[in-house]
Amino acid sequence: MAEPRRHSAGIVDVTFGERVTVVEPANLYGCRIGDDCFIGPFVEIQRDVVIGPRTRIQSHSFVCELVSIGADCVVAHGVMFINDPYSSGGPARGDRTQWRATRIADRVSIGSNATILPVSICSDVVIGAGAVVTRDIVEPGIYAGNPARKKRGLK
């Protein structure tokens, strides 16, 4: 019986701000985490990701390359960020030229098990649990559904 190739990430080449909490196990590598952030267990944050100050990333979330998240955000449990839009009809298979960036501005809350495709989301947005964000969000408000649509403004 063959042995698999094993890769261990853990916490490698991460730039941490002040007063950051990481609950292990977590895979963080080549990313930047701002001041006063919280990273829950079973989170993966890949290289070149930037997390702004006072942002919370809850357990079982996946933040792939080419994602930036602003200040004072909440990423609830099980949120998935996607950087490969399958623009060629299938997976890019590591061809970074086919990947696209995701930009999350400040004060954005993303509900549990939401999926965020390569988009930009403006400040002061709430994304409902289980939502699938397929297009840029340019107006503050509450968004939910698949695909995510604006339900109402913020009060």
Q: Residue locations for each model-derived region?
A:
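Flexible, glycine/small-residue-enriched loop-and-beta-strand segment within the central core
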Residues: 1-16, 22-121, 146-147, 151-155
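C-terminal/domain-terminus segments
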Residues: 122-136, 142
